[in-house]
Amino acid sequence: MKKKYLVAATGLALLGLSMSACSSNSGSKSDSAKTSQQKKKNETISQNKELREKFDQIKVGELSNHGEGGSTIQDVEKLLGKPNTTDTTTVDSYKTKSYIWNKGAVTVTVQFAPDKVVTKDITGFKWGKRDEKLDLAAFNSIQDGTSYDDVVKKYGEPDSLNESLLLGTKTVTALWYTGIKGKDAGANASLTFENNSLTSKTQTDLK
């Protein structure tokens, strides 16, 4: 009888070890998958940040003077490579070229007139998780005339950005999707600056 109990106990012990090993192996696979996903996410964020830094290096020139002072097509291609799409538009003999780069979820659009940058735009970019400093109360406290630099210093760089220069007026429209306190994933704050001074602002679902 003792022999039967011993065999049974040994069998249960082996079964327990086997189940533990399976559980450990399953947990190990799950952890490995999570680590792989996080690594891929970190690489994407890193690549997007590098793209954003290159975007920031593009100089926008005066539209009324054929992009004077702006980066050339060659300058931009050195930073971003060859575009995915190009388009040329002519209005009253005034020619503009649109170059578009698609990098994952991020789209960079640069307009040349005819060979120097007159506008630049980046959409789909997000800085990733950061402190939610920009809530509805903070948004409402931002006054017309506040400088772009002051807003960035307080709330961080915007995610999307559009910049142009016309008749000496530099216009920047900046959107924040991260670093904000929102009701849902679609929440955002949009601020427009002229010559570094806030002229208008809108928000969607901040709280």
Features from the language model and the residues they span:
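Short, composition-biased local secondary-structure segments
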Residues: 40-47, 109-121
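A cross-family detector of function-defining hotspots
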Residues: 71-115, 146-207
